């Protein structure tokens, strides 16, 4: 095995002898590519320079990859996908990372080529998942070193293994939002903003996880010759992990939608109770307004205006009507 650390490019050559040659460099790539019994790991960090930069030229001139796949490597905003060529596979998938400070999931696109004797990964920044793959290769891991299909599986497995802890952390955040939302009664704008943001985030993660599951399913088909049958059982384990991740995403989205529905129902009930009280108050004062309205008209002659006890009689009548309305509304359970 030969290992070289070139600026932005990590190379590992597994040779027939199994030796580790530290002096290996990019100049040795064509020689190893022409040897079907070699195994090459090429990990490229950074997409600076674009398609015409040094990394793009490496993919084009040394590996001979299709121009459309090279374009995909140096542009963003893709969905996971797999393109099957005669002598290699091109796979796009995503690494998830949770920002504890911002409580948001950041995604990093990983583009991977899988050939008969090589695996090439391209990503915009360093990923600890791929560092673990590199360490396993350098430790002469028997499974990983067996074939490019096993290396590709190890990459998938390392990336997907990071999904579950993130889903568990998001689940705890969802539970916290749900508890705050239902306990607070009147939710603050911050809680509602967190809820809507998390729903949007889960939808985005679902749009990445579902096609990733489908990709693994495609790679397990017998027609994909670069993934031998003895490696497919390991890919099935990755697919099971992705199915679990998708189920967790759907469950969390349902919890958030249910919490929002309950909160909306509570708010509606609260408004209805307020309207009921206002209606009761208006009903109580309606006869009083009627009476005072009549006696407030500017006429020279108003009944009982010259009666000594007229004011007290009207006051007593108003009180009687008000008490009567209160008793009536109370019996009707409106107040």
Briefly describe each language-model feature range.
Residues 240-335:
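Hydrophobic alpha-helical transmembrane segments and their immediately adjacent juxtamembrane loops
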């Amino acid at each position: 095995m030969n290992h070289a650390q070139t600026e932005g490019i990590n190379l590992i050559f597994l040779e027939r002898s199994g030796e580790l040659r530290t002096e290996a460099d990019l100049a040795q790539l064509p020689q190893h590519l022409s040897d079907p019994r070699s195994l090459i790991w090429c990990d490229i960090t950074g997409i600076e320079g674009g398609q015409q930069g040094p990394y793009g030229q490496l993919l084009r001139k040394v590996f001979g990859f299709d121009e459309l796949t090279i374009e995909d490597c140096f542009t963003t905003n893709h969905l996971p996908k797999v393109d099957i060529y005669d002598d290699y596979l091109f796979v796009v998938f995503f690494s998830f990372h949770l920002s504890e400070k911002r409580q948001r999931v950041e995604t990093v696109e990983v583009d991977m080529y899988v050939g008969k004797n090589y695996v090439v990964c391209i990503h915009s920044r360093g990923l600890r998942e791929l560092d673990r793959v590199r360490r396993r290769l350098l430790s002469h891991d028997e499974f990983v070193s067996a074939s490019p299909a096993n290396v590709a599986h190890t990459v998938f497995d390392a990336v997907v293994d990071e999904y579950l802890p993130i889903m568990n952390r998001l689940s705890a955040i969802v539970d916290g939002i749900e508890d705050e939302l239902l306990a607070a009664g009147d939710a603050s704008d911050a809680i509602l903003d967190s809820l809507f943001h998390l729903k949007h985030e889960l939808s985005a993660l679902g749009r990445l996880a579902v096609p990733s599951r489908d990709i693994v399913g495609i790679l397990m088909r017998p027609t994909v010759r670069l993934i031998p049958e003895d490696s497919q059982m390991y890919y099935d384990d990755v697919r099971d992990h992705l199915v679990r991740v998708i189920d967790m995403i759907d469950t969390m989205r349902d919890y958030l939608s249910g919490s929002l529905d309950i909160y909306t129902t509570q708010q509606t009930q609260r408004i209805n109770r307020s309207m009921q009280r206002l209606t009761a108050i208006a009903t109580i004062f309606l006869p009083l307004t009627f009476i005072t309205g009549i006696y407030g008209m500017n006429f020279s002659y108003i009944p009982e205006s010259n009666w000594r006890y007229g004011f007290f009689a009207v006051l007593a009548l108003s009180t009687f009507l008000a008490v009567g309305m209160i008793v009536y509304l109370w019996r009707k359970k409106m107040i």
